Amino acid sequence: MLFRCDRKITLPVACALHSCHVSAARLPTTFELELTVEELCKNKAANEFFRLPETKDCRDVFRCDRSGRVGPIRLAAIRCPTQLAFDVDRQVCDWKARVKNCDKLEKPTKVKPLFNTDEPLCPQGQLACGDGVCLPQALFCDGNFDCDDDSDENACSVDEDPNRAPVCDTKQCVLPDCFCSSDGTRIPSNLNPDQTPQMITITFSGAVNVDNVDLYQDIFKDDRKNPNGCQIKGSFFVSHRYTNYSAVQELHRKGHEIGVFSISNRESPDYWTHGTYDDWLTEMAGARLILERYANITDNSIIGVRAPYLRVGGNTQFEMMTDQLFIYDSSITAPLSSVPLWPYTLYFRMPHKCHGNAQNCPSRSHPVWEMVMNELDRRDDPEFDETLPGCHFVSSCTNIRTGEQFQHFLEHNFQRHYRTNRAPLGLHFHAAWLESNKDYKKILSNFIDEKTSQNDVYFVTMLQVIQWMQTPTEITAIRDFQEWKEKCDVKGLPYCSLPNTCNVKSRELRGESFNLFTCMDCPREYPWLLDPTGDGLDLV
């Protein structure tokens, strides 16, 4: 049959390395199909991209669009940008040299377990593999392949996992240990919005060093104070390489929160999405060991995790966090909505869809807080502009190109929170983005000064948000909220004005040398995954 391809782009493809626009230019408009569209689309998900044998360019893929104007199903065509190719296994556009499956037409189909059948196939407490063999229910989605066809690990999303966490039950989920709501928008203790402080969390992710410490000092000046008289605070998720640990020590001394962002900050999304328990343990618990020793953080205050590239590691990540006594994660994003979400605990099921391309959200119950990242609205004029996808890091809001746009962006998103349920407003930055435009830092500073002049707006750390949620306190009493009085007005000099410059090698990194700056004694070797303390342990 002859098929004319609908070239309207209805779903953009995510790029592995950067944001990109999908083009349909020069895609073939007509070609012969050996199968009907219905046959091609049988058993294919709406968001699955595949190739056709009739097309030769590795950039060209298609998906089944069941919302077309003509007929029940149509094919929607997309083309990756120049210099990129489409990886059907990972379902992303990537550099051509990294795509090794241009000859593959579609993502391999995994065998699914037989959860839904007309008649039960297994006795109570057991489920059927794809081949009909019955196994205990507890073996499904536990990270180990138990079925001969591996089907027990192939239906494990938040919506599919047979052992998933239950939906929110507010009678069982009670503060201070547990918080949930059916749609994620409920204010703790059902306070009225006008009696709820508007909390704003400013966070940075990455290395702390000479390139950004001046920026942090400017933003968090000593004289910038919340209405309770305490200096404003931020949260820093620190990666290891290129970090100056004496600078981290000073941030901690000033009362800012330090969290972990991994040791290696490895670029591969799959490494984080499908990482093993040991991968997450060495990366995050190891990063904490490095911070504790070389930034001299000895008060057990490093309790937060953010996954590199926000690639959540599923249940495995949260099992590690539970075992290692991490209190919260801040990697899961919630899609843009008219009313933002409050943070929640993972004892019960997430109150929103697992958002993002190929994300691996936790499906099981975990005693961990999720400091969910509400997407920000990046439209220049929300009243008239068409709907645009939200953004979680401010630096990923690619349409912000001028200081004026940034100013409107901050005010609009503040009002979205302030005028609805006052869920904490997260402003998540990479330092380099703020440095990229001379106006950005000034506009952010002006925004902070303006908001701290209100008696109901507080710039706090992630931990301080949790502390307030555990003991919800109305605005009339918030000035005396003791948990926000710690390190209220820190004065004095840094612990050391001239840190040690330690030039050390790493056997793990092929003998490469690095400079490590610390107020503490120098390590024998550069700390890395198998030797986070740098003691020079024997490597197997």
Kindly label every feature range from the protein language model.
Residues M1-A25:
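Cleavable N-terminal signal peptides of Sec/SRP-targeted secreted and luminal proteins
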Residues V13, H18, E39, K56, ...:
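Extracellular secreted precursors and ectodomains with disulfide-bonded cysteine-rich loops/domains
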Residues L17-H18, D57, R66-G68, L84-A85, ...:
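Conserved beta-strand elements of beta-rich interaction domains across eukaryotes
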Residues H18-L139, G143-S157:
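Cysteine-rich, disulfide-bonded extracellular modules and peptides in secreted proteins
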Residues H21, N47, C64, V70, ...:
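Secreted/processed peptides and extracellular or luminal domains of membrane proteins
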Residues R164-G259, S264-P269, Y277, G286-R293, ...:
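Active-site beta->alpha N-cap acidic-glycine motif
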Residues Y344-F409, N413-R416:
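Aromatic-lined glycan-binding groove of carbohydrate-active enzymes
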